[in-house]
């Protein structure tokens, strides 16, 4: 499932927070993303309508988890591009990878990861 960059940002943030064992709240997510509570609520509602977030709480559905895993793979590939090809430092690479992940296709992600493997 393709998602917008905004949807991707929320999915990846929810996924990362859950993976790190952080108790999620709408306000905590809003703070992490630097948006207002109403803005976060609007996006959470949209993600629920898309079937990516459960109707109660901030847990990803199986479709949401699948989408987040795919985005995570693309984020890692974008990080490889930023670090290995563009020579950015780790912090810059992470920032750019978060921005680029929604725009990186699965095919490009696979090629970037192969490029890294070939260099290692």
Segments the model singles out, each with a brief description of its role:
Residues 1-11, 114:
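Short alpha-helical segments that sit at the start of domains
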Residues 7-22:
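Short amphipathic alpha-helical interface segments
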Residues 20-32:
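Short acidic, hydrophobic short linear motifs in intrinsically disordered regions
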Residues 33-49:
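Short amphipathic alpha-helical interaction segments
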Residues 48-58:
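A short, conserved structural fragment
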Residues 57-75:
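Basic, amphipathic "hinge/linker" alpha-helix immediately C-terminal to the N-terminal HTH DNA-binding motif
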Residues 77-120:
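Amphipathic alpha-helical dimerization/coiled-coil segments
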């Amino acid at each position: 499932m393709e998602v917008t960059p905004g949807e991707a940002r929320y999915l990846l943030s929810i996924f990362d927070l859950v993976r790190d064992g952080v108790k999620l709240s709408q306000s905590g997510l809003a703070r992490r993303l630097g948006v207002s509570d109403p803005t976060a609520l609007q996006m959470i509602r949209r993600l629920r309508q898309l079937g990516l977030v459960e109707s109660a709480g901030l847990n990803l559905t199986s479709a949401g988890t699948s989408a987040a895993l795919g985005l995570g793979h693309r984020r890692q590939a974008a990080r490889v591009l930023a670090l290995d090809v563009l020579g950015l430092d780790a912090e810059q690479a992470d920032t750019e990878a978060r921005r680029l992940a929604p725009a990186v296709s699965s095919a490009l992600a696979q090629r970037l990861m192969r490029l890294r493997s070939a260099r290692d």
